[in-house]
């Protein structure tokens, strides 16, 4: 039922080049540090536009399928990352706010660590 679906958007600016951000976003070792173990999520690539867009079909046990889209844009000497998590069941939407917020914080820490 479309009326019961929700979406979240997170926008973060990082003081790193688009290439550095893309590397941390797509490198398996980096992913395991900022996103954590796969747990009960099945994430399958839907769209990849290197250096710009990564879109995933996201399915978590006990939930309907949803869509995660990460989009990058250069911003001066840094990069803006926009993460949209859409087609979420309303009952799980706020749980994903708590899921993505610390992971995006760890993503920023992973970028800073790589720049040292």
What are these regions (language model features)?
Residues 1-37:
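Hydrophobic ligand-binding cavity/cleft-lining segments
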Residues 32-89, 93, 98:
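Hydrophobic-ligand binding "helix-grip"
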Residues 22-25, 58, 99-100:
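Tryptophan-centric aromatic hotspots in well-structured domains and transmembrane helices
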Residues 1-3, 54, 115:
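Positively charged, low-complexity terminal tracts
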Residues 26-27, 51, 106, 113:
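A very general structural signal that marks isolated residues within well-ordered alpha-helical segments
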Residues 87-116:
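A conserved amphipathic terminal alpha-helix motif
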């Amino acid at each position: 039922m479309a009326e019961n679906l929700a979406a979240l958007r997170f926008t973060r600016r990082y003081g790193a080049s688009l290439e550095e951000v893309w590397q941390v976003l797509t490198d398996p070792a980096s992913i395991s540090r900022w996103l954590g173990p796969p747990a009960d999520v099945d994430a399958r690539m839907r769209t990849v536009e290197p250096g710009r867009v990564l879109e995933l079909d996201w399915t978590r046990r006990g939930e309907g399928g949803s869509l995660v889209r990460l989009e990058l844009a250069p911003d001066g000497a840094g990069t803006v990352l926009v993460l949209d998590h859409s087609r979420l069941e309303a009952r799980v939407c706020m749980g994903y706010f708590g899921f993505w917020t610390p992971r995006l914080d760890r993503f920023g820490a992973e970028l800073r660590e790589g720049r040292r």
